[in-house]
Amino acid sequence: MAQRVPTELGEKPIGILLMNYALPAIMAMVASSLYNIVDRAFIGHYVGTLALGGLTATFPFMNLGAAFGAMVGVGACTVISVRLGQKDYATAQNVLGNTITLNLILGTLFTIVCLTFLDPILQIFGASETTLPYAREYMQIVLAFNVISHSYLGLNAIMRAAGHPITAMALTLCGVMVNAALDPLFIIVLDMGIRGAAIATIISQSLALAAILLLFSRKSELLHLRRGIYKLKASIVRQTLAIGMSPFLMNSCACLVVLLLNRSMQEYGGDNALAAYGIVNSIAFVFIMIVMGLNQGMQPIAGYNWGAHQNDRVWQVLRYTMTAATAVTIIGFLTGMFIPEMPARIFTNDEQIVSMAAHGFRICVLIFPLVGGQIVVSHFFQSIGHAGKSIFLSLSRQLIFLIPGILILPKYLGLDGVWYSMPFADAMSCIIAATLLWWQVRHIRSKEESKA
C-alpha cells in the first residue's frame, strides 16, 4: 500500500502540526549538537585543553562542510514541501534522487581540496603550533569520510518533508547514543585521543545513513529510490541550490566569522581563550539548535500552505514558531547571566578556562532573547521560497555587523571586544529582520485585500 500523501499539513490545527513536526526536529537538532558536545567533553577531560583548542580550530571547517550539506539538504527539503503542496509528486521524487547525486559530487570535491591543503587551512583557521597536530588528526578522519556526513544531513532533512519527522529524530538520537558509547572506547580504552573521537562520529553517522537509505528504498514510500531519478536535472538543481543558497551563504559566512573569531581569540588571549571560545560556542549552539529544530518543524508546514495559497495558516505557524523560539533564547539568556560556570565545567576542570568561558558566555547572551525571532524570520522567508530575503538576512548579521565588530572592537576593548562583537551583531540584525517581516506581511495583506 502506498504511503499516504501528507495533506494533514494543510488541514490539521497549526499548533498540533507544529508540535508534531517541531518536537522531533528539536530532539534531532539537539541530538546533532550533542555529537560535538560529547566529543569535546571527552577530549577536554581525557586528552587536554590543547586538544580542545585544536578542536576549536576545526570549527570553520565544520561550518564550511555544513554549508555545502545545507545548500543541498535544506534546498531540497523546501522544494519537496512546496511540490507536495502542489500535488506535483513526480518532481518531488526526482528531487530525492538529485539530492543524493549532488551530495556525492560536492562531498567528494570538498574532501579532495581540503585534504590537499589541510595544514595551511588549519593555520589560517587559528591553529597554533601547539594545537595544529590535534586539529590535523581530527580533520584527516572527518574529511576522509565527508561524503557520508553530507549525505546523512541532506537525506535526514528530506525525511521530515516526506512525512517522517519522528523517524528522522529517532535515527539522530540513535546516532548520538552510538557516538557517546564509542567515544570512551576509542578515546580512553584504545588510547586513540582526538582521532578516536572523529572515528566514533563517522561510525555513528554511517549507521544512521544506512538506515535512511533503507527506508527510502521501500517502494511503499511516496518518495523512494528508483532508477531514473539520479540524473541531474537543470531545473531541479537550479531551484534546489537557489533556495539552499541562503543556508550555504550563512554557513560560509559563519566559517569566515569563526575564522576571524579564532584568530582574534588566539591573538588577544592565546590557546586558553581559543579553548574557552570553543566551550561557549558549544553551549550557545544547543539553544540555537532548538530554534533550528523549530524552524525545521515550521518549514514543511509553511511551504505546503504557501504552495496551497492558505496564507492565514502560513502567518499562524510563523507566529507560533517565533513565540516558541523567543522562549528558548530567554532560557539561554538566563543560563548565561546566572549560571555560566555550570555548563562550562562539562568540558574541562581547568578553572582558568572555566572562568574565561563563563565571562565570555555572559557577554554573548546579552541580546539572546531577541535572537530566536531573528533566526525564525530568516528561515521563514526560505521556507516560502523567498531566497533573496533569506540570503540578505543571513548575510547581514555576519558580513555587515559581526565581521566589522570583530575587526574594530578588540582594538579598544581587547579580548572583551571579541566577545562583545557577537551581541552587537545580534542587535543590529534583529532590527533588519523585524523591518523586512513587517514589509512582507503588509505587502501580502494588501494583495489579498485588492483581490477581495
Label every PLM stretch briefly:
Residues M1-A22, I80-V147, V189-G244, A302-I367, ...:
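Short alpha-helical transmembrane segments in multi-pass integral membrane proteins
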Residues E11, G15-L34, V38, F61-F68, ...:
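Residue-level signal for short hydrophobic patches within transmembrane helices
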Residues N20-D39, I141, G175, S204-A208, ...:
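Transmembrane helical elements of multi-pass membrane transporters/channels
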Residues A31, Y35, G65-G69, L109, ...:
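Residue-level hotspots within pore-lining transmembrane alpha-helices
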Residues L34-G53, L122-E129, L185-M192, S252-S282, ...:
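Helix-terminus/linker motif at the lipid-water interface of multi-pass membrane proteins
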Residues R40, T49-L52, Y89, L118, ...:
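Membrane-helix interface/capping residues of multi-pass secondary transporters
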Residues L52-I112, S149-A168, A276-L334, F338-P340, ...:
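Small-residue-rich hydrophobic transmembrane alpha-helices
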Residues G73, I141-R160, L171-N179, A197-A210, ...:
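Short runs within selected transmembrane alpha-helices of multi-pass transporters and secretion channels
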